Regions:
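Vicinal oxygen chelate
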Residues: 2-18, 28-117, 127-146
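Short, surface-exposed ligand-recognition loops at beta-strand->loop->(often short) alpha-helix junctions
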Residues: 19-23
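C-terminal catalytic core of tyrosine-transesterase DNA break-rejoin enzymes
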Residues: 120
Length: 146
């Protein structure tokens, strides 16, 4: 990837999902209340917003042209976010109206995860690390890029 130049107008994360919402301002408020995300940049009244998620980021965009949120019953993507306590996070999301798709579950690869849908239909997975496990211990395979 090389050395990226800093720019205060864009998040520093290497990968930044851009998700489309019918109402960006409403989505910013909801994602903050339900999932704890924090707005870092606002572009226009209802055009775009950049949200801080730990050391990562997500950009919200408005509906225009061929850009739209998923339709009911579609799963076009899922965004994974690492959290400290998946059970507490799930309860916060539930109390703020998130549709919980899967309850917090412990997996053999050392993570406790749950998934939720936001009001626009985007799917989010939240993952808490319980312990460090080598991929080979649960059927995965470490691959060196080189």
């Amino acid at each position: 990837m090389g050395c990226m130049k800093p720019n205060r107008s864009i998040p520093t994360a290497t990968v930044i999902p851009v998700l489309i919402y019918p109402d960006v301002r409403e989505a910013v408020a909801w994602l903050g209340a339900a999932f704890g995300f924090a707005e870092r940049v606002r572009i226009g009244e209802n055009h775009r917003a950049q949200l801080r998620v730990g050391d990562g980021a997500v950009i919200l965009g408005d509906v225009r042209g061929d850009r739209r949120p998923p339709r009911p019953g579609e799963a076009t993507h899922s965004v994974m976010v690492r959290v400290d306590d998946a059970r507490a996070h799930c309860e916060r999301a539930r109390q703020n109206g998130a549709r919980i798709l899967t309850e917090p579950t412990d997996y053999e690869y050392g993570e406790r995860q749950y998934s939720a849908a936001d009001p626009a239909g985007h799917q989010w997975m939240f993952s808490e690390t319980l312990f460090d496990v080598a991929p080979e211990e649960w059927g995965g395979e470490s691959v060196s890029s080189g």
